[in-house]
């Protein structure tokens, strides 16, 4: 069973509740059909306390119904599904579909987004570092066929095969109509919000940036590259503010944190608050390659790290992951579900519903991360593959 977490309104001070959907501030409503009813759970919010939500939903007075005389706006419900790091360097050459275990979630979402942790190219020279990742051009078709609509390119592997590799990556993603925020032919393109318009009229803007920036990766006015959240944070925040001013929802993807650490650090938390102040409605983190907690602040959902969504086994990384499903009513974040998965032998996500790995996933995403944090020293000797934290 998936774990449902309520949106924690900052003004209420309440802890996130399990198995309940967030109720809007002024009206009691039925939760969407996808969410399990939870009549025994209590949710506190601004205007008081609601108990037995599913029962009270049928007691809404007639004047609040959707008759022609009502002034209540019709609901515009939609969902976004987010996964973590995606690497297709081994599955694509073998013709393996790593997304089949999560296909139901991808298919049901209005928007699906992941972090693309590789170049899509067969050209270019490898960057001088320990790990460089790429997949052939057919990988773009695999992503599109799986139902992925948006990929973040702001990470420390997009330029693993140089500027020509980035050019190929952008080209094939554009061909299959996948939005690709976070990189471009210059800094104006790299930082620019990419916008998707839904059938219900909602405009969703995506901004991506990375705080992990190898030398030569950052975009400039004259050079292609990625959006830099380490050396040009003011530009990232300006992009978020611009996105918020002209769109309904702003989703920010950030490559940050320390690899294999299950707890976010202060730099992540500080940047998250700055992004929220700038107008972010949803913050999706990646780079640690393991799960980190999911929190809420001012109706913004913060997933500090969504782990590896598709990734071959490497250096003791647990393979515990999941899909974050965020529910919106128009421009308003209403709640979220996290669907626990583990990676199979091919590196693809498969649902997990019980056992130690399931319990570990729940602990970490609900904030009990310290007991599962390996406490690794990132300066460890990388000559020992079993202990190397440098995986991507």
Task: Tell where the protein language model's regions lie, with residue ranges.
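Bacterial signal peptide processing site
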Residues: 12-15
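Sec-dependent N-terminal signal peptides
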Residues: 1-4
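C-terminal motif of bacterial Sec signal peptides marking the signal peptidase cleavage site
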Residues: 8-10
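Acidic, metal/ion-coordinating pockets
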Residues: 29-32, 42-52, 57-63, 67-392
């Amino acid at each position: 069973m998936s774990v449902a977490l309520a949106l924690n309104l900052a003004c209420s001070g309440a802890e996130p509740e399990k198995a309940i959907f967030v109720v809007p501030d002024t009206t009691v409503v039925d939760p969407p059909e996808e969410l399990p009813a939870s009549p025994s759970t209590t949710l506190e919010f601004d205007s008081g306390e609601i108990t037995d939500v599913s029962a009270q939903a049928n007691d809404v007075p007639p004047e609040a119904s959707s008759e022609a005389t009502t002034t209540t706006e019709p609901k515009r419900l939609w969902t976004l599904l987010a996964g973590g790091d995606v690497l297709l360097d081994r599955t694509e050459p073998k013709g393996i579909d790593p997304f089949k275990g999560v296909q139901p979630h991808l298919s049901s979402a209005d928007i699906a987004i992941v972090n693309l942790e590789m170049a899509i190219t067969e050209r270019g020279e490898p960057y001088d570092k320990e790990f460089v990742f790429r997949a052939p051009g057919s990988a773009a078709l695999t992503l599109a066929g799986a139902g992925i609509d948006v990929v973040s390119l702001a990470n420390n592997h997009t330029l693993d095969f140089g500027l020509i590799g980035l050019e190929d990556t952008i080209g094939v993603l554009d061909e299959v109509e996948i939005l690709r925020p976070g990189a471009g032919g210059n800094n104006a393109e790299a930082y620019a919000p990419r916008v998707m318009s839904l059938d219900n009229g909602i405009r969703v803007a995506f901004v991506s940036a990375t705080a992990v920036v190898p030398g030569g990766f950052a975009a400039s006015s004259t050079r292609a590259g990625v959006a830099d959240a380490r050396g040009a944070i003011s530009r990232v925040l300006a992009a978020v503010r611009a996105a918020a001013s002209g769109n309904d929802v702003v989703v920010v993807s950030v490559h940050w944190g320390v690899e294999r650490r299950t707890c976010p650090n202060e730099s992540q938390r500080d940047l998250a608050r700055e992004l929220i102040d700038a107008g972010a409605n949803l913050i999706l983190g990646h780079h640690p390659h393991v799960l980190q907690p999911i929190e809420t602040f001012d109706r913004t959902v913060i997933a500090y790290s969504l782990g590896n969504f598709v990734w071959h086994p490497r250096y003791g990384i647990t393979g515990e992951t999941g899909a974050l499903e965020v529910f919106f009513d128009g421009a308003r974040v209403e709640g979220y579900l996290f669907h626990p998965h583990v990676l199979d032998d091919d590196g693809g996500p498969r649902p997990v519903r019980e056992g130690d790995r399931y319990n570990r996933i729940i602990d970490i995403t609900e904030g009990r991360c310290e007991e599962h944090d390996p406490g690794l020293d990132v300066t460890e000797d990388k000559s020992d593959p079993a202990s190397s934290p440098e995986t991507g």
